[in-house]
């Protein structure tokens, strides 16, 4: 069969497109999503984006009945939503069990009233299981956390809920470069995040509770 130059170019472009599509499909097939609530979503996002095998962590809201809630609505209370983070990871690199273990050891799962300086239901911990396998894994991780602590773990294992991503100003907050006004004065966003995290006592409490098992202290 004889191809003209134009036909050859078209054929090569088609092959490249099909190959790229196959790569994208494979990449998507090799990921799993786990949704957790661990207090301030900036902190949870920052922690898990440092884990090898985590493709992305997205700050948002889950667990409530209000569709497309705003940040102010959620923190004011009454929506039923938690500040939550969707962790998208490659299970060939980091396992679901490892993600769950790190989650429990990065929060205070004995506190039902919020997390650290942030109080109220929207800041409490939770895991949103999207499948029976995720639920079983979460229950196992919860039991192990309770055993390791020798204390009751109050983090609920909930079912699947719609997840609403927070607006762009809350995504990757921990590494933002713009200047923001804080109670500490004007600060570069990444520095404002560090000041907030330190003042809130997150790492101090987690280290006291979990000791050397805490994976993100000082992060």
What does each model-found stretch correspond to?
Residues 2-3, 25-219:
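Flexible coil/turn and secondary-structure edge motifs
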Residues 18-26:
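C-terminal segment of classical bacterial N-terminal signal peptides
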Residues 2-13:
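Bacterial N-terminal signal peptides that target proteins for export
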Residues 12-15, 31-32:
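Exposed boundary/loop context
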């Amino acid at each position: 069969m004889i191809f003209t130059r134009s036909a050859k170019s078209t054929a090569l472009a088609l092959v490249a497109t099909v190959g790229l599509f196959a790569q994208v499909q494979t990449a998507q097939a090799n990921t799993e999503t786990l949704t957790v609530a661990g207090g301030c979503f900036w902190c949870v996002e920052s922690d898990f984006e440092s884990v090898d095998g985590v493709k992305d962590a997205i700050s948002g809201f889950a667990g409530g009945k209000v569709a497309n809630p705003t940040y102010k609505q959620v923190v004011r209370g009454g929506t039923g939503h938690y500040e939550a983070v969707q962790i998208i990871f490659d299970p060939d690199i980091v396992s679901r069990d490892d993600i769950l273990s790190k989650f429990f050891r990065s929060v205070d799962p004995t506190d039902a009233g919020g997390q650290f300086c942030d109080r109220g239901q929207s800041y409490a911990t939770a895991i949103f299981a999207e499948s029976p396998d995720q639920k079983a894994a979460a229950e196992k991780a919860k039991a192990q956390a309770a055993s390791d602590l020798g204390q009751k773990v109050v983090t609920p294992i909930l079912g699947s809920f719609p997840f609403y991503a927070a607006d762009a100003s809350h995504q990757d907050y921990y590494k933002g470069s713009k200047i923001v006004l804080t109670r500490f004065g004007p600060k570069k966003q990444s520095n404002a995040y560090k000041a907030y995290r330190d003042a809130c006592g997150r790492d101090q409490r987690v280290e006291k509770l979990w000791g050397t098992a805490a994976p993100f202290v000082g992060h």
